[in-house]
Amino acid sequence: MKIRSQVGMVLNLDKCIGCHTCSVTCKNVWTSREGMEYAWFNNVESKPGVGFPNDWENQEKWKGGWIRKINGKLQPRMGNRAMLLGKIFANPHLPGIDDYYEPFDYDYQNLHNAPESKHQPIARPRSLITGQRMDKITSGPNWEEILGGEFEKRAKDQNFDNMQKAMYGQFENTFMMYLPRLCEHCLNPACVATCPSGAIYKREEDGIVLIDQDKCRGWRMCITGCPYKKIYFNWKSGKSEKCIFCYPRIESGMPTVCSETCVGRIRYLGVLLYDADAIENAASTENEKDLYQRQLDVFLDPNDPKVIEQALKDGVPQGVIEAAQQSPVYKMAMDWKLALPLHPEYRTLPMVWYVPPLSPIQSAADAGELGSNGILPDVESLRIPVQYLANLLTAGDTQPVLLALKRMLAMRHYKRAETVDGVVDTRALEEVGLSEAQAQEMYRYLAIANYEDRFVVPSSHREQARKAFPEKNGCGFSFGDGCHGSDSQFNLFNSRRIDAIDVTSKTEPHA
């Protein structure tokens, strides 16, 4: 057992109002510069729909994530090393700018400088890539906002698999939900494995996946390898870039920008302890529907004395262990099993989790339109199809989704009886296996959580930071190893980050 810590995130889709504040603030902070105009580290999609970039969930087209070979071993869906080398100069599975959108701005100065005329002046769109005027805007990062466009195009959503989707094109059967997306900072990231330069690495102290800009050579294999399409190519610098989980803020014990500015307060940040030695076995599970449970098995109980003892031996600081014990992510994903991972069938073991939406369900239940199954309404006949949510969050297995929805309904039933009727009705809680204490804690975290409840982020230990002196003036001509001053041989498929050599320790003091 090798214990590591990971900062994870939970997004409560039941409370997302689709305001895009998280997207705009992230854009202003990280990608409001030349070369990254089309990139959105955080974006909010309306589901059902093909998303951004177009049809990103279609891995038969984009070849992202992992596949399990006959011998039980994992391999990137793109292929083995020889196949990657064969595509390195012409990758047929790379999204083009039309799969994203051509970024644009408007000629606002024309509104001020236009000469007097019989017609009102207009601000025409202008491409931010070519600088030329655009005849027509044909796409955007939220092009399908609030079910924009005809159902025929939105019906290409991969989450409609194994469903009779034609009926959902009728107005009376239509449904909608918001899905905020960012880099998943996976436990088993496919982008790390597919980078020919070994430029992508996962930090041991918090699990954040980053791209070393010194080592990146712009091969763009990582863009194809990432099944969530959350790596973007900076055409100005020739490097790939991605969500950095606001690690400068995380190191200071602060939440990410998207979490800090979220209007609906849907985001939760916390630490999870996991067994790094169990990742390969979990990701190699034969049945895709078992991947969710196998990922849960990787996580460890931070209150277990044996886990605490081993974590301290493995170098996990005491402050991180204490933060893991108070983690809202652990409570929602492990204790209550409300939060579910996004597309676990990609076998990357994602670390951004989602609480399935309940608002349309509850409104229908209140209107008396649903049959009941015991105390709770029959959640299998609700407006948002359970199978759709299962295809999105649990590789098609409806049981975890049903349990999460029933537990949220049970908590609301219990609190309504307590608040409105003044009685303690635990029948609904008993039906879904919850105690009164768990229901009260769920209510506190889901409804009235304070800032310190939603964000439990331990600050980094500065005493463990390496010295920056070796980096100073140390970038000469290099190939593969970047500017890290490494004396190791070049390795095209370098799987680990090369640390800098502290030259100060080799310098003898003057007599």
Regions found by a protein language model. Name each.
Residues 1-511:
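Non-ligating segments of multi-cofactor redox enzymes
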